[in-house]
UniProtKB/Swiss-Prot annotation:
GO terms for molecular function: 2 iron, 2 sulfur cluster binding; metal ion binding. Binds 1 [2Fe-2S] cluster. PROSITE patterns: 2FE2S_FER_1. It holds the Pfam family Fer2. Belongs to the 2Fe2S plant-type ferredoxin family. Disulfide bonds join 52-87. Residues 1-95 form the 2Fe-2S ferredoxin-type domain. [2Fe-2S] cluster binds at residues 34, 39, 42, 78. This is Ferredoxin-1. Keywords: 2Fe-2S, Disulfide bond, Electron transport, Iron, Iron-sulfur, Metal-binding, Transport. Ferredoxins are iron-sulfur proteins that transfer electrons in a wide variety of metabolic reactions. Its cofactor is [2Fe-2S] cluster.
């Protein structure tokens, strides 16, 4: 699946948690910390394709709330998983 992160294109397969690819995704300017949804370092905005991604877990929602990321388009990049293949593309931008 085509995923564009801060303008850089990645091919990320369905079912793979983005945190497992942190070393690659960091090249697009997304910073990672713990990669397990606890630290909140990798908050980003899903600009396009949210419907293709997994729902946030309760743990992710708690972390987002704790770090002040309360908008519906904000997610922890490390917790994202593509669940649907019939999407055109997913676009993600890091927080400024």
């Amino acid at each position: 699946m085509k995923v564009i992160i801060n303008g850089k294109e990645f091919d990320i397969p369905k079912g793979v948690r983005f945190g497992e690819l942190s070393h690659e995704i960091e090249k697009a300017g997304i910073e990672f910390g713990c990669t397990d949804g606890q630290c909140g370092v990798c908050v980003a905005r899903v600009i396009k394709g949210m419907e293709c991604l997994n729902e946030p877990s309760e743990e992710e929602e708690e972390t987002l709330w704790r770090v002040g990321a309360v908008d519906e388009d904000q997610r922890l990049t490390c917790q994202l998983v593509i669940e649907k293949e019939d999407c055109d593309e997913i676009v993600i931008e890091s927080e400024d």
